[in-house]
């Protein structure tokens, strides 16, 4: 029986690009209101999982469910309805350089609501304030720091009050202080919005700070080889690959706060 607390369920998923299989036999579920980490070394397919969760890529086999709805097999209209309740932060932040921050955040509201221009501006200002960017409405992305760009991207991701947030390497390229502030913000959004948050990352500090549950992907075997609370995996996993990844900072590998 499916876990009634599950918000997102991945069942028997195989991901491939043409004949090249990236990952096979993925099974995991994300409970409502938790921060779920998709982790593993670079190149193991973490971002590919995220792309399949929102339909940018289609799985070779298997299914993705949002609640009781099979997203993988849903018709286009049903998919669109699901995705309107999902906010996404891409690794680059994906802000439009020709738009102000308020215009960037307001874009989904223009596309999917009947709000007036003034109402959209008010909502955009509120979302920017939620991520610590009050007063930056009329700045352009090039005029703010990388950490502020990530926060602006988060503001846009929550513009439609999503039930779920999917974040692709949110701390990539940030200095340790900015990364820590972003982690704090992610937890604040989880608590204030009650959102389910899936984070693709290999940043150890973030993994241990924000992760309620996780899955560990292994590029060599092309599947998930561990799952559970990151702190519990650190304490109890006997798999050498998992332990090497989770202790690499302590062993002198500069992996605690890496770029990319």
Located regions from the model:
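Helix-to-loop junction immediately C-terminal to a conserved catalytic motif
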Residues: 54
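Conserved ABC transporter NBD signature motif
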Residues: 62-71
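Conserved ABC ATPase "signature" region
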Residues: 70, 117-136
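ABC ATPase NBD coupling module
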Residues: 71-87, 117, 233-237
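Conserved ABC ATPase signature
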Residues: 140-144, 148
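Catalytic Walker B motif of ABC-type/P-loop ATPase nucleotide-binding domains
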Residues: 165-168
